[in-house]
Every structure is written in C-alpha cells, then in structure tokens.
Amino acid sequence: MKTLNDFNFENKKALIRVDFNVPLNDNFEVTDTTRIVSAKPTIIKILEDGGSCILMSHLGRPKGVQDEFSLRHIVNKVEDILGVEVKFVDDCVGPKAEEAANNLNPGEILLLENLRFHDEEKQGDKEFAEALSKLGDIYVNDAFGTAHRAHASTTIIAQFFPERKCFGYLLTKEIESIKKVMETGEKPVLAVLGGAKVSSKITIIENILDKVDHLIIGGGMTFTFIKAQGGSVGDSICEDDKMELALEIMKQAEAKNVQIHLPVDVIAANAFSNDAETQILDVTQIPNGWQGLDAGPKSIENFHNVVMQCKTILWNGPLGVFEMENFAKGTIALGNSIAEATKNGAFSLVGGGDSVAAVKQFGFEHKVSYVSTGGGAMLESLEGKTLPGIAAILE
C-alpha cells in the first residue's frame, strides 16, 4: 500500500484529491471545518518536503456552473486552517488551470474550482481525468468521503500515474481503522448498529457477523427485531416486511456464536416530539399510541457492561432520536461507555452519518480512537465492498 511516506515531494507538484465538500451557511461561510482540518497533515508534509500542492475537490451537487457552489467561497477558511496562502483558479482543467499549475513554486498551494462544474467528473470520463492529470507529478488521494465513487478525480485519474500515486494520511488512517475493526482487531470485537432502518444495515450485519463477538442493535431498527419475536411495539417505527429477515439474522448470529444484545426497555412517548409525555416501558410491551424513541435505563446498563468487556468497538448509528434532548440519553450513555473503554485500552471506531454527528454534538470526538470522515464510503467498506477510489491506488 503506497502512502505519502513512500515519496519525497521535493520540487514535485502533488495533485491531491481532497474532500472539501463542507457545509456553508447563507453567507457562504464554512460551518464545519472537519474535512479541511483532516486534510492538513497531508498538505503540510508535502510542503515541508519542498513540494507544492494542487488541491481538487467537489462542493455540493451543482447543475453546471453555479456560483453558490464555487470553491472560492472557502479559500479564506482553508488559508486560516493551513496557515499558508492559497491561490485559486476558476476552472479545474484547460489552459487557465494548466497555467496556474505551471506557475506554482515549491511551498505554494493552488485550489482548483469545483470539479463537479464539469459533468465529466461524475461520469468518470477518461479524457477529463487525463486533462486533470496534466496538472501534477504525483497523484495523492486523500478523500475518503468520495472513495466509493468511481469519478474522474477519485478513480479514473490514477491510471495516468501508474508509478506515482499514493494515499494521503487521512485515507491511510481510514483504511487502517476499518482493517483493525474488520480483520486484525483484538477480541472481543463489538459492533453497535443503530439508526432507524434495518433495511439500510442488512448488508453490514451480514458481513460483520463473521467478524464480531457481540452485536448491539439499537435505535429504530430495534422494533423490527422485537416485533418479529412476538413483542408489542405500539406505534414505534417498524419494517414489517423485514421481520423474517430479522429472525434470520438472529439465527445466523446464534450459529456463528455472536451474542446479539437488544434493548430491554425504552423511553416511550405519546407523540414524536420533545414535548411529548414519556414513560419507561418494557420493549416488548409498548401499547398503541406510544412509540419507543430512546433506550431505557436497564438497556443502558446492559450495553455498558457489554462495551466494557470488548477490546475492539465499531459504532455506527445512534440509540435514539438524539436530536431531541429528551431522547438523547441512550446515545450519550453509550458514548460515555465507549469513551471509558477506549481510555482502558480498547480501539474504537465511530463512523457513518448520524453517529458522527452525535459524537461531535456531545463532545466524544477526542475520546474515541478514530472518527471516520466518510458516510457512504464507510458504510460500503463495512459491507465488505472494495471502494473504487482505494482499488485505483492499489492496482
């Protein structure tokens, strides 16, 4: 696996695919800088070697050229974070971009305009990828967030750098963290899967049953499993058409000696609202008119005990509707348990959408071993898929 450390970038132009797809407010100010901060170590290493950096990224889902999606909006923020002046060119291929790249001196940074202003980027167009490849000497992929897309800048471009392509530090760390959970992690291994729907996690569950010793299932998907086993779930979210599948998963887990832990009690509410009346109920005895919106106190205690005995932990998906304060306790408690286990030497990886948001919101970001930057890419890795952006560097 070729990484940044396999190259010396002195007098070289590094063409880096970063993931600067960051959220902007109405004034076009960056509201979450995580992805820019995550790219910093790669960029700084290249500059310190005596090289220059040409950064390419997408932003949002523009239809053609739309100013609101221009990467020039983020130039100042990128400069603040890197502590280096960032030049900007308002295209990513063609004479303008080539001239700007050619004029770049060692120690300098150039940010190209949004790749997705060209439809060829998402189409994985070979000629477009070749035009991009003219800008640099060494190709560095450091964008885990788009590694599951076979786009021009993430995958197709690598073929134009057969000997001069590598992973940046961020992508290397992502690959190593997933490998640790899925292959080399110290046992017992625990996966915590939450979120609303079983259907979105089926492939992950099937793939990880061979790799884990314990599986905690929480969040909305709980109720499909409970109802499938004959419990009453009231008005809780439930995928009736997935109940047979839930039973099949339970059967597979038993055959593979994986212990599945479901909530035993819930915080139930008489409406989907933070102001609703609530009560603690047995998870199998929720009356009509009530819905489970968070894990209850007994469940929290049970989950804590499971977490504390595990050495490798994957957390994907919250245990309740944490966006509402009254239904955040389960998710916060789980975060505390995982933080404590990590402090005691466990390896913990948090990844996939909502759990990342929860970890940030409740301040666990620096108390776990690693927080993944890729939503869809992380999920596809856990499903056992080879991501095109990663395969393109390994080939």
Which residues does each predicted region cover?
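Active-site loop-to-helix "anion-binding N-cap" substructures in soluble metabolic enzymes
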Residues: M1-E395
